[in-house]
Amino acid sequence: MTTQAAEVAKRRTFAIISHPDAGKTTITEKLLLMGKAIAVAGTVKSRKSDRHATSDWMEMEKQRGISITTSVMQFPYREHMINLLDTPGHEDFSEDTYRTLTAVDSALMVLDGGKGVEPRTIALMDVCRLRDTPIVSFINKLDRDIRDPIELLDEIEAVLKIKAAPITWPIGCYRDFKGVYHLAEDRIIVFVPGHGHERIETRVIEKLDSDEARAHLGDMYDDFVEQLELVQGACHEFDKDAFLRGEMTPVFFGTALGNFGVDHVLDAVVDWAPKPLARVANERTVEPAEEKFTGFVFKIQANMDPKHRDRIAFMRICSGKYEKGMKMRHVRIKKDLKIADALTFFSSEREMLEEAWAGDIIGLHNHGTIQIGDTFTEGEVLGFTGIPHFAPELFRRVRLKDPLKSKQLRQGLQELAEEGATQVFFPERNNDIILGAVGVLQFDVVASRLKEEYKVECAYEAINVWSARWIECSDEKKLKEFKDKAYENLAVDGGGHLTYLAPTRVNLSLMEERWPEVKFRATREHH
């Protein structure tokens, strides 16, 4: 096996998806703990030793305690290299989250055992389904009261339309939580609560049909055996091929806070989740084992280093190897760049990188030339597909408090739009600036970042826009007619694309009927 093939085979790149408060930040920290990447989970101290969770780094996140921005963490585990992408868990999240899911090969779904499947989980699963992403499931919070586990599995199947195959099964919950039973291996993993940074030695009872198991379960033993027979009769057996096709999810139970069960999930990612997969470009399919370097940018983030107004472009390597000082072709702008200072990530600890392989995520310093969706190669003209822009669902007009700062406002919004924090529209008929977002929190994020990073204070006003659609039309004459007729509602977005801002759903339907030659698109690929 070549070094390259061996390095690719070691990689596992996955994201965590969940509804807010299902325990995603806690599980992220416990995973880092498994990889010995942090000594004390959740209390990585900065110099001032103020304690805040490792993966939530922007000012606003610190105040609200939610991971607004996607961070990337790399750590070793069992001779493998794990790349973990954290997605914003707040109900108000942006396209950032969707795009992060285009950069991974599998996902870990975290469900709150007391609540089951929640709306955000459904939305994220829809995105995973588009790409048949393999999903490992973790039902969390067994140290509290949870719903009937069989009911939870039924709900996963009915609502998320994926077969659920339990790998472990909980023995009791809350104060009666005794551990989990591993169905295939016929053994009990005993629950010993371990908080924070403690890595507890696990106690295992081999065989359910044993005196030791009877003693541990006590009065619960007979009921548990009966429940297990029911489960084994009713549930799917795990089928790795169905998992890799995105049709079945292995389900684990545990408590991230109690530091129990997280290792079972990480083992599943290593043992079953795919190594870096081939990627589709417009021109051809790119295999990870190819010698030549290729990669695409799925996210841009400003100011990871408060001392520098820098912006980092996050790139997923699709093939070949990154080496410090190598030359790359930036395909969209047809320029060669020498990259000497790519970064690897351990949350906000950033280190310079000597080499990286397919499946890894690296950070490039961006001085305004890199956009989301850009492809980098060693010279070949390629464009990776499937990195979408979604039509925003909420709109506000921006009002400047100091009219002399309109230049800074435009620059700030342009940069925040390139980063994917918001979408910006400039109407044809006036000098308004309209912001579009997927969730309300995005407007707060933009206002606070304009103030902190660009020293611009702005206010928002309601505006009569229901939705935005990107316009495409191959017939020049028809397009001109359309532009003349629809002038009042036309705008140009931050990337220079013609956009129709529909005041109502009815208006949009009428326009689509009236102009069959014009395509009104709700998503747009990054080009």
From Swiss-Prot:
Q: Where is it mostly found?
A: cytoplasm
User: Which Gene3D superfamilies has this protein been placed in?
Assistant: P-loop containing nucleotide triphosphate hydrolases, Peptide chain release factor 3, domain III
Q: Where in the cell is it found?
A: Cytoplasm
Give start and end of each tr-type G domain.
9-277
Alphabetized HAMAP family for the sequence: Rel_fac_3
Family to which this protein belongs? Belongs to the TRAFAC class translation factor GTPase superfamily. Classic translation factor GTPase family. PrfC subfamily.
Question: What's the protein here called?
Answer: Peptide chain release factor 3
- Specify the species: Stutzerimonas stutzeri (strain A1501) (Pseudomonas stutzeri)
Gene encoding it?
prfC
